[in-house]
């Protein structure tokens, strides 16, 4: 990982408590981490940025690792990062009893790397299944190549799909007047500029938890730019619900980019079922780490 930063929370140690590796963001991650800590687990939580790390309150048994998985060295890959993390846990004599993938549904490279790496190491892997949200006037797109013909000439669009695919979205909708909401990172800004977006139509916003404050900021952005159509990702969970609410309140058209298919061998469970599957840490103390059947990796 790049520029790793470790934050071990203050509080009594749990020398006998088993370890679990959680890969998450700011949506369901903090809630899931708290529930697992309350169940007695020690957690090593991987987040992409320091801003994401601030969503996790310091708690006994919680260790945060900041940085994209597999970005510590030039040419490194997510799979190399997963292998390194799993090997490191054994070296520290803190082997993971479970790995939980609560990463963004569109972080498909991370999920694929976790499936392969955990399969090789025989460490049980679970995927947090985000809900399928319904309701409201939305249009689903299987991929960005379905954007052709969706935009009227001069129609004001807000692209909230992350920076990596901005150029593709702009190319598919040349008739639209594009605006973008991106994370405040140099690479994201470079990608927005490379897509041909002028600086005055790019907003670099720090991620905020879904709620009233975030809604006010992005509603104000839509009003200022006179947005007519929003393109975002069908990620499930707080992020998608947030954009659904904004578009409903402001009367905007909402286009949702369908999430990529996940590996068929990966066991995905809703939050409560996932917690039940992992169980209490006290039930795992003294037991060997159990590999899952091959179809669950």
For every predicted segment, state its role.
Residues 60-90, 202-217:
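Glycine-rich, highly charged phosphate/nucleotide-binding loops
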Residues 4-8, 13-51:
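N-terminal basic/disordered segments at the start of proteins
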Residues 45-72, 139, 189-195:
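N-terminal beta-loop-helix "entrance" segment that forms/cooperates
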Residues 47-53, 128-132, 162-165, 182-188:
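Short, polar loop motifs at secondary-structure junctions
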Residues 222-225, 229, 233-240, 246, ...:
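C-terminal functional extensions of proteins
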Residues 157-204:
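Anionic-ligand binding region
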Residues 19, 97-98, 156, 228-229:
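Structural motif
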Residues 78-89, 96-146:
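Glycine/small-residue-rich loop that forms an oxyanion/phosphate-binding "nest" at active or ligand-binding sites
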């Amino acid at each position: 990982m790049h520029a790793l930063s470790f934050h071990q929370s203050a509080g009594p140690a749990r020398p006998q408590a088993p370890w679990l590796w959680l890969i998450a963001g700011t949506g369901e991650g903090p809630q899931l981490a708290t529930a697992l800590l309350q169940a007695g687990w020690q957690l090593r939580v991987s987040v992409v940025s320091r801003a994401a790390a601030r969503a996790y309150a310091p708690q006994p048994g919680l260790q945060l690792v900041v940085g994209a998985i597999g970005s510590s060295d030039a040419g490194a890959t997510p799979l190399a990062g997963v292998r390194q993390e799993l090997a490191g846990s054994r070296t520290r004599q803190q082997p993971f009893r479970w790995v939980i993938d609560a990463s963004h549904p569109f972080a498909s490279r991370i999920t694929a790397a976790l499936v392969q790496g955990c399969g090789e190491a025989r460490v049980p892997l679970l995927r947090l299944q985000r809900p399928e949200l319904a309701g409201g006037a939305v249009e689903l797109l299987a991929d960005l190549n379905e954007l052709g013909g969706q935009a009227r000439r001069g129609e004001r669009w807000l692209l909230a799909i992350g920076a990596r695919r901005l150029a593709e979205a702009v190319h598919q909708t040349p008739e639209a007047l594009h605006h973008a909401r991106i994370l405040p990172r140099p690479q994201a800004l470079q990608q927005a500029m490379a897509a041909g977006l002028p600086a005055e139509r790019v907003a670099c916003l720090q991620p905020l938890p879904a709620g009233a404050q975030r809604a006010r900021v992005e509603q104000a952005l839509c009003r200022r730019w006179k947005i007519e159509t929003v393109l975002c990702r069908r990620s499930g969970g707080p992020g998608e619900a947030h954009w659904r609410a904004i578009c409903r309140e402001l009367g905007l058209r909402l286009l949702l980019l369908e999430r990529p298919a996940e590996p068929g061998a990966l066991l995905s469970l809703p939050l409560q079922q996932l917690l039940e599957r992992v169980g209490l840490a006290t039930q795992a103390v003294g037991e060997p780490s159990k590999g899952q059947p091959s179809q669950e990796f």
